[in-house]
Amino acid sequence: MFLLLRCSVTYPKLLQIEDNTKCFATYFYTIYLAISSEMLKFAAIFENIMADSAKTEQQFKDVLTECRTLFQKKLHDYGASWRILRPSSLTDQLYIKAKRIRSLEIKKESLVGEGIRPEFIALINYGIVGIIQLEKGYVDEVDTSDEALQLYDKYALEALQLMTRKNHDYDEAWRSMRVSSYTDFILTKIQRVKEIEDIQGDTLVSEGIDANYMD
């Protein structure tokens, strides 16, 4: 409808032409040009969206690769010693990491030389470890590093797939968020997990601990 109105405003004299055939031919040709122009604009926008989505998915993969590389190196050094940890202990570790990020954001300096980025990587890895512990349970004897890495890959892939689906639905709105907002959001999630743990998982409407770890 807005195309018809625009054409009528642009070419008001068309309605006064005696040759009706020429009038309508010119009129609808104008509409055709207008629609074609809009379709080209839409195609360009759609192409940009697809390109951005592909770029975002690759960025997700690059970050997970970086996290996995560090996780694998620590498996070499320490083994899968984290398999001994109960989920509540992992929640506390996540809390400490997130609190340190917020502290650094506020103070604008670190006295121990480690910045915010390593802590975000640690949050990702501990989150995956938490999901593993929820599913497999904690143990007294650690698993082999190969088995631990297989479990890591399984849940890292699930997290990637969830992020991709959410990115589709939210149309990359997260890119407009401040990093400090992510920190607060993560702390909120961790606090929810602590509350759920305190009531032994007996929730009424809330998502479980695993969903919060995945987020």
Regions found by a protein language model. Give the residues of each.
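Zn2+-dependent cytidine deaminase-like catalytic core
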Residues: 10
